[in-house]
């Protein structure tokens, strides 16, 4: 039977979307990615993206072939969710402490104006959550990055339940590497 859903991992940049794609891949769920953005010191296990993360432009102009990826997970950042055409979606939305996200971004590209950026990131997260709640063609689960690091098996079991038991949880857990959790902020 052909899968009727388009599956998406989403969230702000640096929120753990690549980690979740790795979890799904290791757990045996079909994922779609290419080699357009190779691993580097910021994501040593890879980005697991299509088209170097440039899907949003194609969603905006209606040229992204969503039907081609039915039944597979793809990664689309939070901003891109507003451009999803009508369909049938299951979305894993990753959240992470905004200060940790900004710490990670600064390590990648240098200083940012936190007083300006933090409210924008918070607003984008709220916007994405409202969109997920509002659209009747989207089923979603929110996964906290820190919870995956602290208790990977429990969180991956929760994701597995959302996906109807299609993951090999023990294999998926192996994708989580707490050593890569480098931008820690105690709450």
Language-model features: where?
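Short, surface-exposed acidic
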Residues: 32-36, 117, 164-175
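PAPS-dependent sulfotransferase catalytic domain
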Residues: 71-168
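Short linear sequence motifs
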Residues: 22, 40-41, 114, 133, ...
């Amino acid at each position: 039977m052909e899968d009727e859903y388009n599956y998406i991992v989403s969230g702000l940049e640096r929120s753990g979307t690549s980690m979740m794609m790795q979890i799904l891949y290791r757990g045996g769920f079909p994922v779609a990615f290419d080699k357009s953005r190779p691993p580097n010191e910021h994501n040593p296990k890879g980005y697991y993206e299509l088209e170097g993360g440039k899907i949003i432009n194609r969603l905006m102009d209606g040229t992204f072939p969503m039907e081609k990826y039915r039944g597979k997970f793809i990664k689309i950042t939070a901003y891109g969710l507003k451009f999803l055409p009508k369909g049938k979606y299951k979305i894993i939305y990753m959240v992470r402490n905004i200060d940790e996200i900004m710490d990670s971004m600064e390590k990648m590209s240098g200083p940012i104006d936190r007083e300006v950026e933090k409210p924008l990131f918070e607003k984008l997260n709220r916007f994405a959550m409202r969109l997920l709640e509002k659209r009747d063609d989207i089923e979603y689960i929110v996964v906290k990055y820190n919870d995956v690091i602290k208790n990977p098996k429990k969180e991956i079991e929760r994701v597995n339940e959302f996906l109807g038991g299609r993951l090999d949880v023990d294999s998926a857990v192996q994708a989580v590497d707490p050593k890569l959790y480098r931008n820690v902020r105690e709450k």
